[in-house]
């Protein structure tokens, strides 16, 4: 019972750490593709080395190394 209470308390602290917002703490935030000198290409593109933790504004594209 104590373990469940401690886990619940930990979750509550993590969600309240953002100044009362309901966003959990993220250790790795997604970055825009262009901020890492990447290029957004169509998801069907075969000659693409994907970049981790990046995103494109168009959901039909993925971030590739330039």
Curated annotation (Swiss-Prot):
Residues 23-24 form a propeptide. GO terms for cellular component: extracellular region. Disulfide bonds join 33-63, 40-56, 48-64. Its main location: secreted. Produced by the crural gland and detected in venom from the spur located on each male hind leg. Is also widely expressed in both male and female tissues, including brain, intestine, kidney, lung, spleen and testis. It comes from the Eukaryota. Stereoinversion of L-Met-26 (in DLP-4) to D-Met-26 (in DLP-2). It is found in: Secreted. Transmembrane segments: none annotated. The keyword Ribosomal protein does not apply. Residues 1-22 form the signal peptide. The modification D-methionine is found at residue 26. Keywords: D-amino acid, Disulfide bond, Secreted, Signal, Toxin. GO terms for molecular function: toxin activity. Coiled coil: none annotated. Does not show antimicrobial, myotoxic, hemolytic and cell-promoting activities. This is Defensin-like peptide 2/4. The lineage of its organism: Eukaryota, Metazoa, Chordata, Craniata, Vertebrata.
């Amino acid at each position: 019972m104590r373990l469940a209470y401690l886990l619940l308390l930990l979750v509550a602290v993590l969600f309240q750490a953002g100044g009362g917002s309901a966003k959990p703490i993220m250790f790795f935030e997604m970055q825009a593709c262009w901020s890492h000198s990447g290029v957004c290409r169509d998801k069907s593109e075969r000659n693409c080395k994907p970049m981790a933790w990046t995103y494109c504004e168009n959901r039909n594209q993925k971030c590739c190394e330039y």
